[in-house]
Amino acid sequence: MAKFRPSNILGDPFALMTISISILAWLIAFISSIIADVQTQYPNYSWWAISYMFCVIVGLVTTFGTDTGHVYGVAIVGYLACGLVLTSTSANNLIYGKQASMQAAGAGFILLSMIIILWIFYFGSTPQATHRGFIDSFALNKEQPGDPSYRGSRPMSSTFGARPDTVATNNTPQMYTSAQLGGFETSSPVSGYPGGAPGAERASSAPRFGTPNPSTPGNGEQEVGEVPQPTEYPYRAKAIYSYDANPEDANEISFAKHEILEVSDVSGRWWQARKQNGDTGIAPSNYLILL
């Protein structure tokens, strides 16, 4: 299990605000319920609602502190939905009471219901959702994509989809070296015949090895699959997570959380981006938010 870090809560405005308000609302409901139970007959199921919400708040504090909301999001939403029913029912029966203590308890349950709705909206959405990405962008200590638990839970690698044609993935001619071809170099554009079309003079290709063609780059100068880079980057995006490029793919680009990137095209799931230092490459769009 991930280690509990108080900085995950203190550095996350959303977590700090919702947890603080939920604790305050729970205390209001709890203390007012004690007073109301002494003064008049208090509904027993509201005590169960208070006990249940205590467990939910403790669980949410643990979840925010360990930054494992993306792991247990489905279970959290289920528990919150049950809690919303309990708090809403209690609020409806207490807010209309004649005693001030019962009305105060009802107000506490109303605040709890409002916080639960916010939590359901947050945990019930995927990390790629726009509103969740915006909320997480203010957090200082969110779990990084390089962590094993992060890669195993986020749908980045399994469901993100294939990349569109980019710098080195366009349909460019396949280039081979002379050693790879083993002497079967083609001296003409005709495909399927080593050395050119049938009947062509094979001796005509001999000067190619001694006199380089000025219009053809020398050996070692040809870039495999090279396509001109885009010259305009009209969009600006902010990284909501850090991303480490795949070492096996030279097209990907690494960037840090909160880093500002320039983007040339935002139509696909992989965006052609340029960093402030001039490095260019492709970046996953669900790690970025447009400015």
From Swiss-Prot:
SMART domains: SH3. The keyword Ribonucleoprotein does not apply. One of its GO terms (cellular component) is plasma membrane. Residues 145-173, 187-231 are annotated as: Disordered. One of its GO terms (biological process) is regulation of actin filament polymerization. The chain crosses the membrane at residues 15-35, 45-65, 71-91, 104-124. It is found in: Cell membrane. Residues 1-14, 66-70, 125-291 are cytoplasmic. Residues 36-44, 92-103 are extracellular. It is a multi-pass membrane protein. Forms homooligomers. PANTHER family: FCH AND DOUBLE SH3 DOMAINS PROTEIN, HIGH OSMOLARITY SIGNALING PROTEIN SHO1. Plasma membrane osmosensor that activates the high osmolarity glycerol (HOG) MAPK signaling pathway in response to high osmolarity. Belongs to the SHO1 family. This is High osmolarity signaling protein sho1. It comes from Penicillium rubens (strain ATCC 28089 / DSM 1075 / NRRL 1951 / Wisconsin 54-1255).
